[in-house]
From Swiss-Prot:
<dbReference type="GO" id="GO:0005829">
    <property type="term" value="C:cytosol"/>
</dbReference>
<keyword id="KW-0808">Transferase</keyword>
<dbReference type="InterPro" id="IPR035902">
    <property type="entry name" value="Nuc_phospho_transferase"/>
</dbReference>
<dbReference type="InterPro" id="IPR000053">
    <property type="entry name" value="Thymidine/pyrmidine_PPase"/>
</dbReference>
<dbReference type="GO" id="GO:0006213">
    <property type="term" value="P:pyrimidine nucleoside metabolic process"/>
</dbReference>
<dbReference type="InterPro" id="IPR036320">
    <property type="entry name" value="Glycosyl_Trfase_fam3_N_dom_sf"/>
</dbReference>
<keyword id="KW-0328">Glycosyltransferase</keyword>
<dbReference type="InterPro" id="IPR036566">
    <property type="entry name" value="PYNP-like_C_sf"/>
</dbReference>
<dbReference type="Pfam" id="PF00591">
    <property type="entry name" value="Glycos_transf_3"/>
</dbReference>
<dbReference type="InterPro" id="IPR028579">
    <property type="entry name" value="Thym_Pase_Put"/>
</dbReference>
<dbReference type="GO" id="GO:0009032">
    <property type="term" value="F:thymidine phosphorylase activity"/>
</dbReference>
<dbReference type="InterPro" id="IPR013102">
    <property type="entry name" value="PYNP_C"/>
</dbReference>
<comment type="similarity">
    <text>Belongs to the thymidine/pyrimidine-nucleoside phosphorylase family. Type 2 subfamily.</text>
</comment>
<dbReference type="Pfam" id="PF02885">
    <property type="entry name" value="Glycos_trans_3N"/>
</dbReference>
<dbReference type="InterPro" id="IPR000312">
    <property type="entry name" value="Glycosyl_Trfase_fam3"/>
</dbReference>
<protein>
    <recommendedName>
        <fullName>Putative thymidine phosphorylase</fullName>
        <ecNumber>2.4.2.4</ecNumber>
    </recommendedName>
</protein>
<dbReference type="GO" id="GO:0004645">
    <property type="term" value="F:1,4-alpha-oligoglucan phosphorylase activity"/>
</dbReference>
Length: 509
């Protein structure tokens, strides 16, 4: 979210600012006295949207009110930390508070709620207002829900993608081929990106990877990578890292490549929704803005993955490639096994330990993660003509085995601010098999829920460590998994859910 910079409007009464040290995540909030003369003259009430003006800087915020003089006097306005930072004020400065201009693009949101398709202009207006911070979480939820109830068609998806690109920065690289990769998600522990970037960059291709934080999963790539190295890179730092090492693994929200998407993601996380059209627009807007020419898309398919069957995966792949082609981006979609978690760790730090094990060729490194990363890296190497058709996976495995991938990963981490050790949880508790038998099913959705209740991704060390895989023969009382938590409260939440959730790991006698 950014502050608007615009000419000052008609002179309005001013109020002295007070910093409340109130943390409201990304949403600017202001607090005013119920008897404040501005509230009376402007007709402002609690939860009104207000426009704050400090010189040329303007911020849209949500108003809350207080009685009495214990918190604020009648001539003061209290600011949350987000509002304070966006306005760029100092204690005692004066700002103007007024009604904001009418939010015209909401008419298009209402049309979408009632089942009407939106054209490029309508979507562009919505996205511009979202990026400018004019949409509240209620407005955002309405748009996202309407886009889920009546899924975006191909034209809407392409128009939304273009609108999201238009409000952000774009990068260009002095290379004929710039590769990227993305996983559509829904599969716990599938942390291939750091490995893929290391392999691809070690072979001389350019891969400026910007990744998101978790939306509905226990960890996103940025969450995991953050336990190993800084990911909040500004545009200049990102460019320096890529020019020096050929690749990076950075948080996309820090570089303003698709700022509207970062706002959408925050509300999608709270709604626990991730629809096809929004997913495609989110992924492609960031890849195109990052200057990519080619992208490999990992689509895990499984009974409890995000994509349940091959027909659905083929439809998604077709839609991705069709929309990407409108922007000159070549997309290669790879269907992968989504029947069970990848690797052993689920949660930022636990997944980071798996990544390190694969890159360092540890004897106990999860082989499924190694092979999946090699498959995806191989596709990128073939696209970039570093390997012949059908030979990319072998080159990727060779790059891991001879240590070049680990050396490149170390160099990327150092360039981003330094390699560090992931944290370990203070509390670890096993969930054991109630009977002997064979593991026949692992519920990815329940497993992700368990890891999130254990604190992931906010608690970096929280999550789940898997001890079994499909087909394993196990004894009664043998650990199926271990829950990792940073606090006793998070551990209790997770264990309570595990007791009520039914079979997370299904055993057949």
């Amino acid at each position: 979210m950014t502050a608007l910079v615009s000419p000052a409007g008609p002179e309005q009464p001013s109020l002295r600012v007070r910093r409340l040290l109130l943390h409201t995540q990304h949403q600017p909030v202001v607090v005013m006295h119920t008897d404040c003369h501005v509230c009376r003259s402007e007709g402002l009430a609690a939860r009104s949207q207000v426009l704050l003006t400090n010189g040329a800087r303007q911020v849209h915020a949500t108003l809350f009110q207080v009685d009495g003089d214990a918190v604020l006097s009648h001539d003061e306005v209290g600011l949350s930390e987000t509002a304070w930072d966006l306005l760029g004020v100092a204690e005692g400065d004066e700002v103007r508070v007024s009604h904001p201009p009418a939010l015209e693009s909401l008419a298009s949101v209402r049309r979408r709620i009632y089942g009407h398709r939106l054209d490029a202009q309508a979507l562009s207006e919505i996205v511009r207002d979202v990026a400018a911070g004019r949409y509240t979480d209620v407005h955002l939820a309405a748009f996202l829900t309407a886009s889920a109830a009546l899924p975006l068609d191909e034209n809407e998806t392409a128009d939304l993608t273009g609108a999201m690109i238009a409000v952000g920065d774009r990068m260009e690289w002095d290379a004929p081929t710039v590769v990227d990769k993305h996983c559509v998600g829904g599969l716990p522990g599938n942390r291939t990106t750091p490995i893929v970037v290391a392999i691809v960059a070690a072979n001389g291709l350019v891969m400026p990877k910007t990744s998101s934080r978790a939306i509905t999963s226990p960890a996103g790539t940025a969450d995991t990578m953050e336990t190993l190295a800084p990911v909040d890179l500004d545009l200049a730092t990102l460019r320096r890292v890529v020019e020096a090492e050929g690749g990076c693994i950075a948080w996309g929200g820090a570089v303003h490549l698709s700022p509207a998407d970062d706002i959408f993601v925050r509300v999608e996380r709270e709604l626990d929704v991730d629809t096809e059209g929004q997913l495609i627009a989110s992924v492609l807007s960031k890849k195109i803005s990052a200057g990519s020419t080619h992208v490999v898309i990992d689509i895990p398919v499984g009974p409890t993955a995000k994509v349940r069957g091959e027909d659905a995966a083929s439809h998604l792949a077709s839609r991705i490639t069709a929309v990407a082609s409108r922007f000159g981006l070549a997309a290669t979609c790879v269907q992968t096994d989504g029947s069970q978690p990848v690797g052993r760790g689920i949660g930022p730090a636990l997944e980071a330990f798996d990544v390190l094990a694969v890159l360092q060729n540890a004897s106990d490194a999860p082989d499924d993660l190694r092979r999946r990363a090699a498959t995806l890296a191989g596709a990128a190497l073939e696209i970039g003509r570093k390997a012949g058709k059908g030979e990319g996976t072998a080159l990727a495995l060779e790059t891991l085995a001879d240590g070049r991938a680990w050396k490149k990963f170390e160099a990327i981490c150092e360039a981003q601010g330094g390699l560090r050790a992931p944290p370990r949880a203070a509390h670890v508790h096993p969930l054991v098999a109630p009977r002997a038998g064979r593991v026949v099913h692992i519920n990815n959705r329940k497993l992700s829920r368990l890891a999130k209740l254990a604190g992931a991704p906010e608690s970096k060390a929280g999550g789940v460590h898997m001890d079994v895989r499909l087909g394993d023969e196990i004894d009664r009382g043998q650990p199926l998994l271990h829950v990792h938590a940073e606090t006793t409260g998070e551990l209790a939440y997770a264990l309570d859910y595990a007791a009520r959730a039914g079979d997370i790991v299904e055993i057949e006698a």
